[in-house]
Swiss-Prot record:
Domain of life assignment: Archaea
A GO cellular component annotation in the UniProt record: cytosol
Gene name tied to this protein: tpiA
Record keywords: Cytoplasm, Gluconeogenesis, Glycolysis, Isomerase
HAMAP family, sorted: TIM_A (MF_00147_A)
Name of the protein in question: Triosephosphate isomerase
Any single GO BP term: glycolytic process
Source species of the chain: Archaeoglobus fulgidus (strain ATCC 49558 / DSM 4304 / JCM 9628 / NBRC 100126 / VC-16)
Amino acid sequence: MRKMGVVIINFKAYKEGFGKRALELAKIAENVASRCDEYVGIAVSFLDLPVIAREVSIDVYAQHVDAVGFGSHTGRINADMIAEYGAKGSLVNHSERRLKLADIEFNVSRLRELGLTSVVCTNNVPTTAAAAALNPDFVAVEPPELIGSGIPVSKAEPEVVENSVKAAKEVNKSVRVLCGAGITTHEDYVKALELGAEGVLLASGVVKAEDQKRALEELVGLL
């Protein structure tokens, strides 16, 4: 029997995952999480995070934090701020919100100091190994050309998943590796686990689905 897998749903800035619809989807995720054997977390916009973190029992992540502390940083949102509003942690360096190496290290370190979870996104094997060296909780490898494509990385580029897991573990045995890009079905999810990943980071496969509840239920094997 395999151990619990990890499913983190990134709401991005999709209309279907913002405001009232974000809260509705968060409650769907909470309901599905209560009925399956997988860990289900969600990454939501800064504006939705305080409300959703209060309203659901599953873990809620920020999609990004700025690599700054408190001070003269107009328009920035740092790790301390999301902690105060109930976030479990944050994505770091998503392909749509890339950071410099020093900023990734700053965020991972500060999130750890606050007792928050860091999910560092990478795009290939070398960057996965480099990210693992920073000692985040998770590294999520997502080839950018497959993001939102509906073509799962676990099928299109299985060697990227396998080699990323191997490279990360050689650097840091405790880091957990997720894979993303194009994940939409239970078959995609199971394949990712078979390749050595401990779970998936996905977005459009659930958020933009015509029936979000059914899409998530199918992904985690409830259908």
